[in-house]
């Protein structure tokens, strides 16, 4: 089995990101087809047949550089395949909420958590990865992107994007975006967006947006 194929089935396997390369997160349907019917490989090299570097959508392969961008541009269907593509960083063209690139190498194809975990291992510090999970220890800070989950230890700060879940320990602060859930420990502050749920411990403050539910512990607000 090739190294790439092995990584596909075991994203935790040690992977060394070459100099000048970056990782792009993207999704395909169960048949590995993208919008418009472009066929992606399960692993290995892939290229766009009609590449155009102009900063407009189309004429390129598309995805979220380091997993950052518009979470509405990936598929959240249960059958969706999540891919990690190694690309030339300098070749990426910034678009609205995503990037496009001429070619790359698929190094992972599988589930969301496997893909986002692989990206997180190599992404710049503080990167908010769409669909990812971020966990920090005591005094730490955890930030997750759209639909992600962020958990921080005591006195930490946890922030999750839209539809995400944020949980902070004692004296922590948890903030979740639209439709998210935020839970903070004693003396913490929990803030959830519209339709979210915010729960704070003793002496905490819980704030929920429209249609949300806010629950604060003893002496809380």
Annotate the PLM regions.
Residues 1-221:
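Short, glycine-biased loop/turn motifs at secondary-structure junctions and
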């Amino acid at each position: 089995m090739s190294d790439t194929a092995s990584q596909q089935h075991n994203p935790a396997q040690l992977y060394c990101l070459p100099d000048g390369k970056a990782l792009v997160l993207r999704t395909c349907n169960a048949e590995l087809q993208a919008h418009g019917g472009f066929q992606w490989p399960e692993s290995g090299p892939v290229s766009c047949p009609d590449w155009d570097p102009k900063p407009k959508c189309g004429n390129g392969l598309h995805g979220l550089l380091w997993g950052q961008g518009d979470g509405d541009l990936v598929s959240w269907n249960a059958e969706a395949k999540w891919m990690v593509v190694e690309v030339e960083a300098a070749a990426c063209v910034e678009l609205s909420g995503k990037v496009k690139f001429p070619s790359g190498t698929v190094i992972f194809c599988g589930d969301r958590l496997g893909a986002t975990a692989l990206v997180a291992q190599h992404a710049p510090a503080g990167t908010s990865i769409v669909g990812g999970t971020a966990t920090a220890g005591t005094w730490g800070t955890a930030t997750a992107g759209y639909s992600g989950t962020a958990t921080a230890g005591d006195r930490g700060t946890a922030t999750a994007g839209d539809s995400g879940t944020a949980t902070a320990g004692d004296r922590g602060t948890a903030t979740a975006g639209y439709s998210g859930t935020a839970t903070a420990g004693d003396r913490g502050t929990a803030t959830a967006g519209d339709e979210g749920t915010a729960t704070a411990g003793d002496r905490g403050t819980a704030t929920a947006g429209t249609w949300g539910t806010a629950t604060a512990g003893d002496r809380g607000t």
